[in-house]
């Protein structure tokens, strides 16, 4: 989605060639404003579609709050609107009590620092989970549904997202918990056949060995000289994804035909 936005602005910049500088700036600002509004509307639509599917899939309201697990941050801090995954959470919370488990998302703590902050600010009940506790909490029956975002979705429905997402999906499938992905259509990559074709970023393993690696005084949490591996993303197979929610509608497994249909919409 970020690449799409950059390319859109580059196209607008090239199209404005030959115009006076002030006019070019105004045209680019107008294009950025349109993009912002479209993203805001897309987030709201994803929220509606996702909340409707979850309500229909889970049936009658539970005795207590609907318990949603999410991983990393896919909210207002990552979009111009209410977010993708958190847009679904917010839409759910508008109609029923919701309690959220936010995976902490080591080593940069996007879940603890960003997702938890967003939800608490909105008055939505949120509890931070250590990443390693997600499967256990899912197995305990405390999670009604998992909702995550996506960085890239292959044509067959394989989903690349923050590392740890795959483990959440596996636990959900093992214990009968719906696993939902929310992402704009620009995240769907028809030119990428499967998740095997998605390159995974491997970051400096030292980031895993430090507490608050981006802080001013990071603290080592491992013996000196011991290495670490840090793939920043993983790929969840399409077969583990119950629904992929976009602003144009959603796809349910198997996803190849459903995603092609969504991409073909105007």
Role assignments for model-derived ranges:
Residues 97-98, 103-266:
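Conserved phosphate- and dinucleotide-binding cores of soluble alpha/beta proteins
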Residues 1-129:
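N-terminal active-site beta-alpha-beta segment that forms phosphate/nucleotide-binding
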